[in-house]
Structure formats: C-alpha cells, structure tokens
Regions:
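Polybasic/polar functional segments that serve as interface/processing modules
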Residues: 1-40, 50-86, 100-101, 111-125
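Catalytic metal-binding acidic patch
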Residues: 42-44
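Short hydrophobic/aromatic beta-strand micro-patches
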Residues: 46-48
C-alpha cells in the first residue's frame, strides 16, 4: 500500500498528532526520520496513554480520523491485544502509542535521536 498521492508524510504525521491530541494523549512527539539513512519510515509519531482503554481509544481514533479525512487504512496494526504499545503503520508514517512504563523502557526518542524531534506545536526540540 502506498499513501494516496494527495497525502504527504509530513501532513499525515501532523494530522495523526492532532488526532492523538483529540483523544487526550500525552507527550506527543513527531520524529522526522527523512534525513536518516536506511530509516524504516519518514516519521514516527509517539504518544502516551494512561490506561489500556485509553491507548485503545487513541489507536481507534487515529484509524477512524485518517480514514475519514484521507480514505486510507493502515498497512498494519500491532499490539492491540495487550495495549502496552500499539503500532499503527501507514508506511511513510508510523504511530506508536505507549503506556508510560513501556515508553520509558524503549525510549524511541533516544534510539532515533538523530532524527528531528518535533513537539505537538511543530517546534523542534
């Protein structure tokens, strides 16, 4: 699946961050990975949910909002059964929704620290 020509990855990453914010996700960060050689995607969008139900709600909200606006479904979705870390893969943009402990353990911000970190207000960190 390739993202619809009308959607660019930057626009989609910001839209996903907005969707997360609408579901009261916390600590929303976009990581621009375009400059990193051999990166797996253009952008990661990271967020934290405060319970399994909250994480599931954020994930479902992203799918619904992206489909409603862009008529696109994710290529893959993982982690829904345990809701500690849900990954929604739109190929060029990958959304990660964590519980607080899992986010701290895997610390993708540090792991992919060569990318540009952008907070939800589009400000580079």
């Amino acid at each position: 699946m390739k993202i619809n020509q009308e959607i660019n990855s930057s626009k989609l990453s910001k839209f996903i961050a907005k969707s997360m914010d609408g579901k009261k996700a916390e600590n929303i960060i976009i990581i621009n990975l375009k400059k990193i050689k051999n990166s797996v995607t253009d952008y990661f969008v990271l967020a934290t949910g405060n319970s399994n139900i909250h994480i599931e709600s954020i994930a479902n909200g992203i799918e619904y909002d992206v489909f409603k606006k862009f008529n696109e479904k994710p290529w893959n979705k993982e982690g829904v059964n345990n809701s500690e870390w849900v990954v929604i893969d739109f190929i060029n943009v990958v959304a990660h929704i964590f519980n607080p402990d899992t986010r701290e353990t895997y610390n993708l911000e540090k792991l992919w620290g060569d990318g540009d970190l952008i907070n939800n207000n589009n400000e580079k960190k």
